């Protein structure tokens, strides 16, 4: 059993790489992982070999698993939705800047991805941006201007077209236009008090009270 953990921040203050055995993570390791997640926003685990059940067990250390409203899950594992690009498809599922399921009334606090087959070249990379840094770099006047703004998030936003192939294949029959939610665009992390921008170009359709130009 390996109960060691190392945490190495990535460049540009976006994310951290964590080396730990997630199959044998004790309370101390889990505490360190949660602290790193709140500090860096995104964390990466290398060289893991988890069964589906072990993956779900690890996920539940962070809270109840959310249901993805648009697509059917794995038959035996309702907590898991498969993200894939099939041969011949030109559109990448979920391609474009977004935060998952922000069009729901209670969006998940985190998203977990477990890579099984990843291309060695081309569009195999998932990119991440720090919304902590986005907020920090705003000047004081702009921070004040957006402090109480809210946005409308829609499942029928710009990124919805990337789901069409999967929905045709295994959609739940939900009308994306019916999934709308209003959220503040400045969020405060309840664990450390850090503020971040909560905007999703793939899902935001309108700023409340702000006229479109």
Predicted regions and their residues:
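Non-heme Fe(II) oxygenase catalytic core, chiefly the N-lobe of the double-stranded beta-helix
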Residues: 2-213
């Amino acid at each position: 059993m390996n109960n060691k953990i190392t945490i190495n921040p990535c460049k540009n203050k976006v994310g951290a790489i964590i080396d730990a055995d997630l199959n044998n993570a004790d309370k101390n390791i889990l505490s360190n992982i949660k602290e790193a997640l709140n500090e860096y926003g995104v964390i990466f685990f290398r060289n893991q070999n988890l069964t589906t059940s072990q993956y779900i067990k690890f996920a539940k250390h962070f809270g109840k698993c959310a249901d993805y409203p648009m697509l059917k899950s794995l038959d035996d594992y309702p907590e898991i939705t498969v993200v894939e690009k099939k041969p011949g498809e030109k559109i990448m599922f979920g391609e474009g800047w977004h935060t998952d399921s922000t069009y729901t009334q209670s969006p998940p606090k985190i998203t977990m991805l477990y890579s099984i087959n990843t291309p060695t070249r081309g569009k195999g990379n998932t990119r991440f941006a720090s919304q902590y840094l986005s907020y920090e770099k705003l000047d004081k006047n702009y921070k004040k201007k957006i402090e109480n703004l809210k946005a409308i998030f829609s499942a029928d936003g710009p990124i919805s077209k990337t789901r069409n192939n999967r929905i045709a294949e295994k959609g739940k029959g939900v009308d994306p236009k019916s999934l709308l939610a209003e959220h503040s665009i400045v969020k405060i992390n309840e664990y450390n008090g850090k503020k971040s921008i909560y905007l999703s170009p793939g899902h935001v359709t309108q700023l409340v009270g702000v006229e479109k130009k």
